[in-house]
From Swiss-Prot:
Listed GO CC annotations: chloroplast
Organism superkingdom: Eukaryota
Record localization: Plastid, Chloroplast
Chief site of localization: plastid
Organism: Platanus occidentalis (Sycamore)
Alphabetized PANTHER family for the sequence: MATURASE K
Keyword annotations of the record: Chloroplast, mRNA processing, Plastid, RNA-binding, tRNA processing
KW RNA-binding (keyword) present: yes
GO biological process: mRNA processing; RNA splicing; tRNA processing
Name the UniProt record assigns to this protein: Maturase K
A GO molecular-function annotation: RNA binding
Cited function: Usually encoded in the trnK tRNA gene intron. Probably assists in splicing its own and other chloroplast group II introns.
Amino acid sequence: MEELQGYLEIDRSRQQDFLYPLLFQEYIYALAHDHSLNRSILYEPMENLGYDNKSSSLIVKRFITRMYQQNHLIISANDSNQNKFVGHNKNLDSQTISEGFAIIVEIPFSLRLVSSLEGLEGKGKEIVKSRNLRSIHSIFSFLEDKLSHLNYVSDILIPHPIHPEILVQVLRSWVQDAPSLHLLRLFLHEYRNWTSLITPKKSISIFSKENQRFFLFLYNFHICECESIFVFLRKQSSHLRSTSFRALLERTHFYGKMEHFVVVFRNNFQTILWLVKDPFMHYVRYQGKSFLASKGTPLLMNKWKYYLVNFWQYYFYLWSQPSRIHINQLSNHSLDFLGYLSSVRLNPSVVSSQMLENLYLMDIAIKKFDTIIPIIPLIGSLAKAKFCNVSGHPVSKPVRADSSDSDIIDRFGRICKNLSHYHSGSSKKKSLYRIKYILRLSCARTLARKHKSTVRAFLKRLGSELLEEFFTEEEQVLSLIFPRTSSPSRRLYRKQIWYLDIIRINDLANHE
């Protein structure tokens, strides 16, 4: 945001809606270049990100001029197969325009966010900024604190628009620049299979690297609109207000939307505000999959279910079937979420109480939030990546002839450490040890295959210590902080550990 403010000297009161001329500015594509290099630096090598040096604003200017001269903005269903828009430089043109357009179309949202932050600071309200809120594992900490007090949960698959024009019309309330909206229509017609990009069952990673930022913006904006009802109802309900609410919504640009829905939907939703009078109502989402948990009754959950279906259909023209929302009782249901199976289990315990000469034994059941690794889907992901077969038997992976042993070991070790780091919150470590065993033996088979030997002969010749270095147990890492001699540390090794530096789901763990 500081970069945008430095480059863009825009009068917010009059010029923030005129975005189309910015397509012809050199610094827009410089920003797009910087964002493309920084977006996945923690997970992908720099050489895999890449950037086409032939892309420049000069090509964009010539391309847009040619597009208007040949009247390519008018696209009908009859000539969709003979679209001259792409020409012979389809990848270059679409990548360059979409990267710049993705930067530009975010400007109104960023400016509204800054205005909201400045307004809150002027009123003396403190905005809590913490990078820990970005961590996926922070969701499990929230669930561990809240779900043990709730009874029912609804699994919700957020619907996707059936026509691209719906998304354009919704975006029109934020961006009032007609040429920019026409250009958006052009992109959506160009990517005719765009609806598959925001299907809830698909991962964000399916977006092509060339247009990832553009489609990520469309996806996040679509989700933001679908969730707007929760923002309004939570603000209106006196029982659901909290000081941390604004901090949690900081990165999703809900500040302007909160004020907007208070004005627009006040009259329409006043009669249904009683639905959220229960203070034990919580909503969690990642990508297109979300959960709505409550301490209420099945009748209340069913009313929420049909209300959401009608709301999405009436206000956003999103076709959603009631069968896409499943209501389950937490005591006998596991949430398949973010690579974990989460559930609330009763942990029985016996408490003895002595009063004078009488001894009383009381059976007490305490609710406990439990997370385990779904071993079968994870083995399926490993089999798909050619680390093992479908039954979990490790196999060797084909490698390049010029790959060194250290490169192969580093690759397997990095995958093993990432999985161990991500699944450190599992309450049962046996499944995690099995995954480590598969990766370890697959690495040994790969090295033996390269040297045209057997695994036993290879390890006997070089020593089993060759593979010990990178398969570091979680306990060994924790021992650097907590000494093993203390009894609390031994219990710590068996407990769930949540890290606050994980900002996306592991690719192998994303088996949905």
